[in-house]
Swiss-Prot record:
One of its GO terms (cellular component) is cytosol. The gene is miaB. Residues 5-123 form the MTTase N-terminal domain. It catalyses: N(6)-dimethylallyladenosine(37) in tRNA + (sulfur carrier)-SH + AH2 + 2 S-adenosyl-L-methionine = 2-methylsulfanyl-N(6)-dimethylallyladenosine(37) in tRNA + (sulfur carrier)-H + 5'-deoxyadenosine + L-methionine + A + S-adenosyl-L-homocysteine + 2 H(+). It comes from Clostridium acetobutylicum (strain ATCC 824 / DSM 792 / JCM 1419 / IAM 19013 / LMG 5710 / NBRC 13948 / NRRL B-527 / VKM B-1787 / 2291 / W). Its cofactor is [4Fe-4S] cluster. Belongs to the methylthiotransferase family. MiaB subfamily. Keywords: 4Fe-4S, Cytoplasm, Iron, Iron-sulfur, Metal-binding, S-adenosyl-L-methionine, Transferase, tRNA processing. InterPro entries: Elp3/MiaA/NifB-like_rSAM, Methylthiotransferase, Methylthiotransferase_CS, Methylthiotransferase_N, Methylthiotransferase_N_sf, MiaB_methiolase, rSAM, rSAM_horseshoe. One of its GO terms (molecular function) is 4 iron, 4 sulfur cluster binding. Residues 379-441 form the TRAM domain. This is tRNA-2-methylthio-N(6)-dimethylallyladenosine synthase. Monomer. Its EC number is 2.8.4.3.
């Protein structure tokens, strides 16, 4: 009997990309391919790319360059490049010109076509370059090979309508399209039947959910509906745009026992001047008022964020506004980024681009403040008993288990492997900068 062919997928970028890779893997499983962790062994290599920052693109170029030798050694190796980076104007042609050994290039709107492209390459030994300019309707029921066996990503909507001036996402992911609530509910019910305990609802802006549907539906109503699914233990979600986070959503999080008390609420800047230039549609004051509303409405809530340093025209005063906002809000954690020029976005043409050395100086100052606050917030957990969903063995210490609190804190602790996949209580004995240490009680 012929040995099954092996595939290897490398994914850059956000959780949406991670779920797209799970769908690619699901289609390949149906084509009798098996997954491998080793590029050298693979008959098919897929790079699922990101273009939110230049650094992500440089990683793709570097990794593609290393595949040339492998392709020379294994002429039948099929190399595929897909995802957001490919959806950019002229990028597919650039990739084929620079890396002619790539066999399949496709974008974000035609993932479901991948089996056909692969068969064409296998049968005809030709290459396929297929980028769809416009998003089609949502394709339901695609096979999916999940990365975990107790927690799963479930996309509730695709695309983005916000057009922040620094961001490439609306250009490569298309306009907002919401899935029908019954399709989302049925997918989660099937996952629960298979033993899944935690679901993370995904969307570029989950608070816009339902706007493209014919029926009366919004994100708050969806949370309440999904909270009734029997056997599901936890519901998480990301990402929330501050301008669309309503009182109804705050109330739903507070009321629904399965919805975790954690909101990822990207602020991007603490300066109203910069927020206007970014087209974020809220002011510093709006954001702080929203945070106060969240904190008073949801007990023990954790708030995390994204911050961009060095946006064009950012003055020292603008940066200090960001720093003071971080100290006022006291985020549980923050993803901090240096502004990266993205061709095709309005901000790429803005004057007063900030010199790299100034960006780095501000970035380091911000990071120091963020980390100090994270550690302080973690220390508040010392001595407390918290509910953990046990996810598996600790990545740093195989003799320990790891899991997360409802607020998303990573906890390492000694325990029995039979606890994996269960909710247990753990007493926090020590707080570290990025994680907690505990013992089962």
């Amino acid at each position: 009997m012929d040995k099954n062919k092996l595939f290897f997928i490398e994914t850059w970028g956000c959780q949406m990309n991670a779920e797209d890779s799970e769908k690619l893997a699901g289609m390949l499983k149906e084509m009798k391919y098996e997954a491998t962790d080793n590029r050298e062994d693979a008959d098919l290599i897929i790079f699922n790319t990101c273009c939110v920052r230049e650094n992500a693109e440089l990683k793709v170029y570097g990794n593609l360059g290393t595949l040339k030798k492998l392709k020379d050694k294994k002429p039948n190796l099929i190399i595929t490049v897909c995802g957001c980076m490919m959806q950019q104007r002229d990028m597919a042609e650039h990739i084929k010109k620079r890396f002619p050994f790539v066999d399949i290039v496709m974008g974000t709107h035609n993932t479901q076509m991948f089996p056909q492209y692969l068969k064409k390459v296998e049968n005809e030994r030709t290459s396929v370059v297929e980028i769809w300019d416009k998003e089609e309707g949502i394709v339901e029921g695609m096979p999916i090979y999940r990365s975990y066996d107790m927690k799963a990503f479930v996309t509730i909507m695709y695309g983005c309508n916000n057009f922040c001036t620094y961001c490439i996402v609306p250009y490569v992911r298309g306009r907002e399209r919401s899935r029908k609530p019954e399709d989302i509910e049925n997918e989660i019910k099937e996952l629960v039947k298979k033993g899944y305990k935690e679901i993370t609802l995904l969307g570029q802006n989950v608070n816009s959910y339902g706007k493209s549907l014919d029926e009366e539906m919004n994100f708050a109503l969806l949370l309440r509906r999904l909270n009734n699914i029997e056997g599901l233990l936890r519901i998480r979600f990301m990402t929330s745009h501050p301008k669309d986070l309503t009182d109804d959503v705050i109330a739903a999080i507070a009321d629904c026992d399965k919805v975790c008390e954690h909101i990822h609420l990207p602020v991007q800047s603490g300066s109203t001047t910069i927020l206007n230039k970014m087209n974020r549609n809220y002011t510093r004051e709006d954001y702080i008022n929203l945070v106060n509303k969240i904190k008073s409405g949801i007990k023990n809530v954790a708030i995390t964020t994204d911050i961009i340093v060095g946006f064009p025209g950012e003055t020292e005063e603008d940066f200090e506004d960001t720093l003071s906002l971080v100290k006022e809000v006291e985020y549980d954690s923050a993803f901090t980024f240096l502004y990266s020029i993205r061709e095709g976005t309005p901000a790429a043409k803005y004057e007063n681009q900030i010199p790299d050395e100034v960006k780095h100086k501000r970035f380091n100052k911000l990071l120091e403040a963020v980390n100090l606050i994270s550690e302080k917030k973690n220390k508040e957990y010392e001595g407390k008993i918290v509910e953990i969903l046990v996810e598996g063995k600790s990545k740093n210490d195989g003799s320990k288990l790891m899991g997360r609190t409802r607020t998303g804190k990573l906890v390492n602790f000694e325990g029995l492997e039979s606890s994996i996949g269960k909710l247990i209580n753990v007493k926090i004995t020590k707080a570290q900068a990025f994680s907690l240490v505990g013992e089962e009680v």
